[in-house]
Amino acid sequence: MDQDIKTVIQYPVGATEFDIPFDYLSRKFVRVSLVSDDNRRLLSNITEYRYVSKTRVKLLVETTGFDRVEIRRFTSASERIVDFSDGSVLRANDLNVSQLQSAHIAEEARDSALMAMPQDDAGNLDARNRRIVRLAPGIDGTDAINKDQLDTTLGEAGGILSEIIEVKGDFYEYLEKFAEDTSMIRGVVWVYNAGSAVGGETVVKVEKPTTVYSVPYLEINGSRQEIGYHYDFDPATQELTLAKPLVAGDFLMAMTTESYLPIESLLASPVGAEAIGTKSGKTIQRILDESPRYFTPEMFGAKGDGLTNDTKALQDAVDAAMSSGGGKVILKGNTTYLFDHLLVAREKSPQSRFEARLIIEGSGGSVLKHTGSITEAAHAFWVRGVLGTGSLADIYMRDVVLRDFSINGTVTSTANGLVLQRATAVRIENVYVNDFGGNGYRALDLYDSTIDSLEVQRCGIVPGATVGSYGMYITGAYDQSNANHYIACRVEMCPLIIAIDKGCRHNYFHNCKFEQGRVNPTTSNPVYINDATELAFEACQFVQNYDSAIRFLVVTDALFPYWVTHGTEKVVNFTDCSFVCSRSVTAYWIDVAYTTFTACAFSSCNGGTQFPLSLGKNSFLTDAKVVIRTAEGNVLELKGSHSRVTNLKVTYFQQPTSGVFIKFTGLPGLSDVVVDGFTFENFEPFAPYSGHTDFMGDVVVMRRAGYVYNGTNDRVIYGCSTLSYSGASPATWNNLRNGYNGQVVIVHAKSNPVTLDVSGGLIITKTGSNVTIPTNGVSALVNISGVWRQLY
C-alpha cells in the first residue's frame, strides 16, 4: 500500500530555515506550525516566519516547548485561483492551474486520510505509535477497551493476587531468593528408575550426586503434574511425595534445581537444547526452531560430478524443504548437478505452512546441467502452483527465492529453461539460464514478484531451425501476470528476445538489456508485445544485430476492450530507453500502437525504403532523438489517429538522397495527429513530408522547433495544417484548410514563385487578392478564428 505523505513534512527544531518539498499555487495555501506531542502553534507569515525563496522559509520566533516544525500545504477548495466567465478567452495555462488546484486538493485529502488512521497491507488499522483518544468502553468480546477499563480489571486482579501473597508469603519469599541465587542451576532433567516405575510407589527419592533444592516441574507419561496438588518435594529428604501411586511401567521425568550442572546429563536429555542459553538470551532450541531448515542434494545422495544423474537427489532435497514447511536448499559451489527436470510444486507444501519460504541458493560456480530430457511438461526447472480449475485455480505457489546459480541447457532440446507458473511473491537473484532450445525464461500467471539480475543467453532456436521460441516469454490468463518487477535483467544472443503476450498487466522493466543474436529470425518479431497493457520500460536498451526484412519491435493494437476505455489511453511506456540497429532493415524497424516513448534515443542505419519509426493509434513520441546513418532519409510514419510527436531531434550522418522526414498514412480517416517541435542536425531531409491530405477535419500541426528562415537550405514549408498544391515547387496554393486559432505558417518559395490563391475564400491577404511570393521569397500566415491572414 502506498503510505507516502506528499503534502506534509515535519523537521526537528534546531535550524532556522526549512525547505518546502512540494509545489503550491499560492503562499496562503502553505501553513507553518510548531508541533510537539501535546501542543501545536500555527505561525503567521511575515511576523513569525518569512519566505527566503519560493521553496524555503525562515523562522522568526523561538521554538521553546516544541520539538518539530511542520510545513503543510492546505489548498482552499472554495477560493479558486482561476474563475471562468462566459465569453472569456480560454487559455491552456488557466486550465492547467485550475486542474492543478483540484489535484492539490485531492492529494491533500489523501494525505489527511493516510495521516488519520490508514490501513496496512493486511487491512488492519494502523495508529502508527500514536494514542487513540476519547475511546468508549468496549462492550462485545471483540471491542477495543480504554485505559480506565484496563486499570479497573487490573485492580481487581491485583486484589486477588494480594490475597494469594498474604496466604503464601513465605512461598513467594522463597521464590524471590531462589530467582536471585546465581549459584543455582535450573532445568536439569532427571528420570526415575531408568524410565519404568515398579508400581505402587507414592514416595520417590531423587537420587543425584548433587543436592537438589527444588523440583518445579514433573511429568508422568507426558502429563504435567502440579506442585502442591499432585506432588510435593522435601529438600531435606530429597523425596517426592505423590498424590497417587505409580503404575508399573510409568515414565516419571522431573526437572530439578541443583547446586552445579551435570553437563553430561543435561546434554543427553530430551530437552537439553532448551536448557542451554546463549549470549543473545535465546536457548539453543529456540535458535534451532527459528532458523530455516537446511538441505543439500548431497544429503540425498547427489554426486555433483556433472556425469551422474542427480535428478532424484535434487528433487528429494526440494521436497524435504517443502514438506517441512519451508527451508533452504543449498547448492554446493563449483559443482555441476546433472538433472532431467526439477519441480517446485505447491501441492508438496503443507497447507498449514503455506506462508513458509523456500530458498534454493547456490554460490560461485553452482550449476544445474540439463540432460536434454523434455519430460515433466517440457520444462527443465518448473515452479508452479496447483494446475486446475474452479477452486484449484486460486492455489498459487508463493514465497520462493532462487539465488546465485546457473541452469545450463542443451540447445538440441526444445525444453524451456526456467518456468514460473501460477506463482506469487517469487524472487529471483543472479540466476543464469543458458542454451535452451525453448524459452529461456517463461512466466505464466505470475504476479507480485521480483526478477533481479536474471540473465538469459543463447535460448530460443534449436540449431538448424528458422522458427523458434523467445528468450523471455511472459503471458497469463486475463490479468494474472501482473505487478512484477524486472530489474537489471539481460537477454542476449537470442534470435527472438522477449514476448509479452495477452494477460499481462502492470509489469515493470528497469535497467534491462535486450540484445538480439545467434540466428537471424525470418518470421517472428524479436520484441513482440501483444494484448498486454500498462507495461513500463525504464532505462532499458534494445539492440538489433541482423539485416532483417521483419519488424524488430512490435506493439499490436489488439488490446482488451476493458482496459482501453478512452481514445487517448497509453498502455505501453518506454522512458529513457535506447534502441540500436547496427544493420540494414528493409521493413519497419519499430511498429507500435498504444505506446508512449519519452526521452528515448533511436539509432538506425535505415538501409531500406521503409520507416524506422511507425506510430499507430494512441501513440506518443516526446523528447526523442533519432539518428539516421544512411542516405535513405525516411524517419517517421504516422498511421493512427490520436497521436503526438513533440520535440523530436533528427540527426542525419549524411545528406539524404531520398525519402521523407514524415509520412502520414491511413487516409482517409486519420485525425487528431500533432507534430509539434522538431529540429535537424548536420543535414536537412530530402523532403519534409508526404501523404498529408484528406484528414477528417481535425488539427494536424507541423511546427518546426525555433523556426528561423535558413536560406537555400530551407524547405518549402515548416508548420502547416492540411494542404494540397500544384506546380513545380509548388507554383500555387489554393487550399490551406483547417488549422487552429493562433497557428503560424511560414511559406518559402524555394525554386519557383508560389501563389497564395484566395479564390476559395480560405486565405485572406492584406489586399484581399492573390499574392505571389517570388522565388526564394518568404511569407507568413496566421490563423485567426479559422481564417488564414497574411502577416507579411
Swiss-Prot record:
The keyword Metal-binding does not apply. Pfam families: Pect-lyase_RHGA_epim, Phage_T7_tail. One of its GO terms (biological process) is symbiont entry into host cell via disruption of host cell glycocalyx. It comes from the Viruses. Its main location: virion. Keywords: Degradation of host capsule during virus entry, Degradation of host cell envelope components during virus entry, Host-virus interaction, Lyase, Viral attachment to host adhesion receptor, Viral attachment to host cell, Viral tail protein, Virion, Virus entry into host cell. One of its GO terms (cellular component) is virus tail. It is found in: Virion. InterPro entries: Pectin_lyas_fold, Pectin_lyase_fold/virulence, Phage_T7_tail_fibre-like_N, RHGA/B-epi-like_pectate_lyase. GO terms for molecular function: lyase activity. Interacts (via N-terminus) with depolymerase 2 (via N-terminus); this interaction probably gives rise to a branched tailspike. In the N-terminal section; belongs to the Teseptimavirus fiber family. Belongs to the Teseptimavirus fiber family. The N-terminus anchors the RBP to the virion. The central part and C-terminus probably binds and degrades the host exopolysaccharides. Functions as a receptor binding protein (RBP) and probably mediates the attachment to the host capsular exopolysaccharides. Displays a depolymerase activity that specifically degrades the KN3-type polysaccharides of Klebsiella pneumoniae capsule, which allows the phage to reach the host cell membrane and bind the entry receptor. This is Depolymerase 1, capsule KN3-specific.
